[in-house]
């Protein structure tokens, strides 16, 4: 039987990145945008759902557009929010990969997540919500009102 899995986006879904969005206005400053992510407050409602899925024996997949070089920072942030490494599998953007989030996540889904039965996704990006709907995956829109 295929293992049931749930996909969680990170920025804007599990973490509230609003305090660093100003780095993406005008000339995009990705360096500072990513370097400040450790300050993101958790989005508690989404974390409750992650823990619920984990306790229901669903595989937790964190699928993020964050670059691989921020893996340790991301793992530490998750640990600070009581998500231990044994609780999830995380897929990140390869270093020097500049493809769109939708292209990245579609590729990872089709090449690395095909062994799972993905039953739900939590996402804040409208284009990715559409992608998961096209894949017949139930999606919860986690976008915050700005």
Model-derived features: where do they sit?
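Short loop-to-alpha-helix "cap/lid" segments that border enzyme active sites
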Residues: 101-111
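Short, surface-exposed linear patches
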Residues: 28-30, 82-85, 113-114, 141-146
